[in-house]
Amino acid sequence: MSSQSIRLQQIIARGFASVAAGMGSLLVTAALVWGADPVGPAAEGFKTIPPNKTLSTDTKKRLEIEGLVRRIINGAPLTGNETIFDGYYASYLFPQWTQTTEEDLKALPKERDKFIKNSMELAGAKNPTAHSRLLDLSHTKLAEVAQDPAFHPAVRYNAILTVGLLNEAEPNRGTGIKQMPEPYIKALVTLLEELKKPGNNEAVRVGALLGVTRHLEWDNSKPVGSGKRIPPAMRNDAIAELTSIVNAKVPPAGRSMEGQTWLRRRALEALGQAYALKVEPDFAKLLSSIIGDDAEPISLRCTAADVMAHVEYPAAALPPISPMAKELGYLALFACN
């Protein structure tokens, strides 16, 4: 990183710290985050998939099947047990996630976390064959739920969040061997489709945005030329959609101005991941224009300042130091008044 770029980031960091210190209760934290699902009240009239009747009513049989699945996840041979393995997830576990009682909906975040840790991550470490099979199966089945408007919004949101968490290579937690997660590239296709879909459910679109952000974030850890990075065309598609969200100042019908600002901030953060290693001139101009625009919401301007502090500027995209420091000073004063 050049000395100019380092100096700019130091100025931005100090300026943003002043802004953050003075904001207090002015910034509203959105409810739609990874651990706070919009479950809402239980409601009738939504589509559900009945879980396998035998496993739902015969405890002994269910425990037997779950024991076999756990053994496979932990390294036992999958060969000869594919039908049972697939059926447990496709006909029992995932259908449970479509139920709409209040208890079922509230349990979705916990069940999602348990599935990722105890099935996906564990299989990735213990049984690559089972992991690969479950990866494809999970993406297929959960994408179907996320894309179907007949399901409860919370059910669809949970499904698209899980799609966004799927990895081709899982992190090696607690093994002492450093392994960064490699998000499942096929899932990114689904995430972008749901993010771009006109009139899509708001919760599904937010879940897709969070998933796209995660893909862009972890893409930065993949070596250039490794063949594992997001294809350029797909990356450009994501950047174009995210930029359009950031530039959309007027909310569509049914969305509040606060909700629109929140969505713009998340899209701006996602772009920060896309440009974390090298800021392009167009993105540098976008950040500077938001920071210096008094008509923009203060929370969005602060997000732009925060993003600017965490990306690397090459010489061609580096904004003038003095004017930018001045804009950040104005932003700090405005936020603290």
Predicted regions and their residues:
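Bacterial N-terminal signal peptides that target proteins for export
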Residues: 2-24
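Short, flexible loop/turn elements at secondary-structure junctions
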Residues: 22, 161-164, 210
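Hydrophobic core
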Residues: 24-28, 32
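Long, helix-rich interaction regions
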Residues: 31-107, 146, 150-155, 168-183, ...
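Acidic/histidine-rich, surface-exposed loop or edge segments in extracytoplasmic proteins
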Residues: 93-96, 113-121, 140, 144
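Non-membrane alpha-helical segments in proteins
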Residues: 106-125, 157-166
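Intrinsically disordered, low-complexity segments enriched in glycine and mixed charged residues
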Residues: 109-113, 126, 130-140, 181-187
